[in-house]
């Protein structure tokens, strides 16, 4: 691939970690990875309170176990997804096929947009359940900072994942333009739609015409050499 495609150089080059960490989409992946840790870590550690009267734990978000479960599930899965695509970022320059690079970038667009949607749903869900929580369920305000942190970083994650989708779409547009020649170019000699294929005979002797090509004697030139006499029988 001349000049590379889809945001990376030619395949087979040496791995450059410094160039990798400077990529905007790689930076956003690391930030999203950290945000996911904050979300599910906050809920797991301080999102469940002990009830003295009931003798069992309950979710800090309006006693709704689904709210805590959603936050933990989205956080853990986003954490794993970030690791997967960080590994893909490392391997991406080694992909030699333009079609495979295109598939990787398209999957990045779809997955990032999908996670931005999931974080939006999670933010709205947790914020709503936190708003309707009853003060009597938590009179000592235990874990309130962690609950707010999970909501805040769910909100921030919407933009980090949406940013990844936008950057992946830009890579797709740039890559499609740079890969256009390599995908659509056809050698004229192999194109069956052309009426004829050009042919140039290499020159092996002097050029009497001075035109830089070969010289051929016209077919109707008078031949002065005797060809012999054939007698006819009468």
UniProtKB/Swiss-Prot annotation:
Q: Name one GO cellular component term.
A: neuromuscular junction
**Cellular location of this protein?**
Cytoplasmic vesicle, Secretory vesicle, Synaptic vesicle membrane; Melanosome
Keyword rRNA-binding listed? no
Biased composition, Polar residues: where in the chain?
Answer: 214-234
Q: Name the residues that span the membrane.
A: 24-44, 72-92, 104-124, 149-169
Membrane topology type, per the record? Answer: Multi-pass membrane protein
Q: Which residues lie on this side of the membrane: Cytoplasmic?
A: 1-23, 93-103, 170-234
InterPro entries reported for this sequence: Marvel, Synaptogyrin
**Sequence segments annotated as region (Disordered):** 192-234
Q: Does the keyword Aminoacyl-tRNA synthetase apply?
A: no
UniProt topological domain (Lumenal) ranges: 45-71, 125-148
* Domain MARVEL per the UniProt entry, residue ranges: 20-173
Superkingdom of origin:
Eukaryota
Q: Which GO terms describe its biological process?
A: cellular response to leukemia inhibitory factor; regulated exocytosis; regulation of long-term neuronal synaptic plasticity; regulation of short-term neuronal synaptic plasticity; synaptic vesicle membrane organization
Residues the record lists as N-acetylmethionine modifications? 1
Q: Which UniProt keywords apply?
A: Acetylation, Cytoplasmic vesicle, Membrane, Synapse, Transmembrane, Transmembrane helix
Q: Pfam families of this UniProt entry? A: MARVEL
**Function summary:** May play a role in regulated exocytosis. Modulates the localization of synaptophysin/SYP into synaptic-like microvesicles and may therefore play a role in synaptic-like microvesicle formation and/or maturation. Involved in the regulation of short-term and long-term synaptic plasticity.
Family, according to the entry, reads as follows:
Belongs to the synaptogyrin family.
According to UniProt, the name of this protein is Synaptogyrin-1
The organism named in the record is Pongo abelii (Sumatran orangutan)
